[in-house]
Amino acid sequence: MKFQILLFFLGRMIKSKAKSDPEYKKKLAEKNCTVQIKTADNKKGRYYTFTNGEMTTAKGVAAKSDVAIVWQDAKIAFETLKKGNQKATMQCIQNGQLKLEGDGGVALWFMDKAKQAR
């Protein structure tokens, strides 16, 4: 549940930042894409769709995404994301607890925009 709440609030932060910061909104318009964040068993997740600088988000697994950020399970995802540091994330990748499926460039773009939204 904590993982899903964190993903929900990530979407709220991105929307809020875009509403209050015209430069940030321009950066969101750089890509039209769908980013999926989910658990490996597909039981928990959320996706974010960016179209011409606007973002929509929904709970669940998207039918199609440009990149999927796949966590081994919700507990590992929440604990790692809560730390908010790149070292912890890289450790999860090295341990096989986090995988990217699809366009890594889109994943990096999304992670940068998520970080800027804080």
For the regions a language model picked out, list residue spans one by one.
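Feature captures hydrophobic
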Residues: 1-118
